[in-house]
């Protein structure tokens, strides 16, 4: 059975050019230097397997560099996570300096209370979601598009009711342009090391584990986005809100939230063209899905009408033959 997909033209010409990294944090009016108190990789690739430990703070195929720094953050304040295509990308040297516009999906943030943010491994239990934005059903607009239009600034409000102390702050986005095939969703995340002060400590959030919070077949992970969607279920638990009943259940998103920053970036109009793809079966990767790369454990045989094309040591993709 064939699935009719609408593939953005921009994706056809730049399918390998638009990974991304959370590489700076702004707090209390201070924009810290690249990689300051953030475990950043030098390579901007994704994590595709949600069952690995690397889904917490990156690593594995994208080795991260430890940081001995911690950023002070006031509970109840808003911090800004800054995303860039690479650690060196700027508007002057990179046309897709945040993320390629074809990489559509949700944007989220999590926190984890730790004893020492500089040494905690990140993976395991203790994570709670504090913000999310997915699909605006009315406009069919995605959170990643808003992130690009906001110059890569993800605004995150730190809950005022949590306990003081050190935390890992996990900023994440998921690119769903290849999510119709097994392990096709591309997860991008880094962890910042922060120290929270001014919190009331009146609430203890319910938590989830990374890995564990996401499943490879979750409806927000395995999905064909090239259709009109009436709903989209953002992966993971519902965000923690001070004073609200707590739950770790997933919920459908019809998000209309916008970033709080007023920074904007003009983007060109995306032209769509019709195409078709074969749904992936056992051992077969769909057209436009990943088919290889360092650490890749999914299908390496492409669906009929496509071939596996190597773009780097870390990423290969099924493209029309």
From Swiss-Prot:
Binding site for O2: 177, 186
GO cellular component, one term: extracellular region
GO annotation (BP), single: cellulose catabolic process
Superkingdom to which the source organism belongs: Eukaryota
Cofactor(s) this protein cannot do without: Cu(2+)
Keyword Heme assigned: no
SUPFAM superfamilies: Cellulose-binding domain (SSF57180)
Location(s) in or outside the cell: Secreted
Signal peptide residue numbers: 1-18
Domain CBM1 span(s) in chain numbering: 283-319
Biotechnology: Lignocellulose is the most abundant polymeric composite on Earth and is a recalcitrant but promising renewable substrate for industrial biotechnology applications. Together with cellobiose dehydrogenases (CDHs) an enzymatic system capable of oxidative cellulose cleavage is formed, which increases the efficiency of cellulases and put LPMOs at focus of biofuel research.
Entry-listed glycosylation sites: 33, 195
Binding residues annotated for Cu(2+), in chain numbering: 19, 103, 188
Cysteine disulfide partners in this protein: 57-191, 161-242
Entry-linked SMART domains: fCBD
Cofactor annotation comment: Binds 1 copper ion per subunit.
EC numbers: 1.14.99.56
Keyword Glycoprotein in annotation: yes
Gene Ontology molecular function, alphabetical: cellulose binding; metal ion binding; monooxygenase activity
Functional note: Major lytic polysaccharide monooxygenase (LPMO) that depolymerizes crystalline and amorphous polysaccharides via the oxidation of scissile alpha- or beta-(1-4)-glycosidic bonds, yielding C1 and C4 oxidation products. Catalysis by LPMOs requires the reduction of the active-site copper from Cu(II) to Cu(I) by a reducing agent and H(2)O(2) or O(2) as a cosubstrate.
Protein family according to the UniProt entry: Belongs to the polysaccharide monooxygenase AA9 family.
Protein name: AA9 family lytic polysaccharide monooxygenase C
Organism expressing this protein natively: Botryotinia fuckeliana (strain B05.10)
């Amino acid at each position: 059975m064939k699935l009719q997909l609408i593939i953005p033209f921009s994706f056809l010409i730049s399918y390998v050019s638009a990974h991304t990294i959370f590489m700076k944090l702004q707090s209390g009016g201070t924009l810290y230097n690249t990689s300051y108190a953030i475990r950043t990789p030098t390579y901007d690739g994704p994590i595709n397997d949600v069952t690995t430990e690397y889904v917490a703070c990156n690593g594995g195929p994208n080795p991260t560099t430890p940081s001995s720094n911690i950023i002070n953050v006031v509970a109840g304040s808003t911090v800004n996570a800054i995303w860039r295509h690479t650690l060196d990308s700027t508007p002057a040297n990179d046309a897709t300096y945040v993320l390629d516009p074809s990489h559509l999906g949700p944007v989220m943030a999590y926190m984890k209370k730790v004893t020492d943010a500089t040494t905690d491994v990140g993976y395991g239990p203790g994570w709670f979601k504090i913000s999310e934005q997915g699909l605006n059903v009315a406009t069919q607009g995605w959170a990643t598009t808003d992130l690009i239009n906001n110059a890569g600034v993800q605004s995150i409000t730190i809950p005022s009711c949590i306990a003081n102390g050190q935390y890992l702050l996990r900023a994440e986005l998921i690119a769903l342009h290849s999510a119709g095939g097994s392990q096709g969703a591309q997860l991008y995340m880094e962890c910042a090391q922060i120290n929270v002060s001014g919190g009331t400590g009146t609430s203890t959030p319910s938590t989830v584990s990374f890995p564990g919070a996401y499943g490879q077949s979750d409806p927000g992970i395995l999905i064909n986005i090239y259709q009109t969607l009436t709903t989209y279920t953002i992966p993971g638990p519902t965000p923690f809100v001070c004073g609200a009943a707590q739950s770790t259940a997933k919920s459908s998103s019809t998000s209309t939230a916008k970033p709080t920053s007023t920074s904007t970036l003009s983007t060109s109009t995306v032209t769509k063209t019709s195409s078709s793809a074969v749904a992936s079966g056992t051992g077969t990767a769909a057209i436009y899905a990943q088919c290889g790369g360092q650490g890749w454990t999914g299908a390496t045989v492409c669906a009929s009408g496509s071939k596996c094309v190597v773009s780097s040591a870390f990423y290969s993709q099924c493209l029309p033959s």
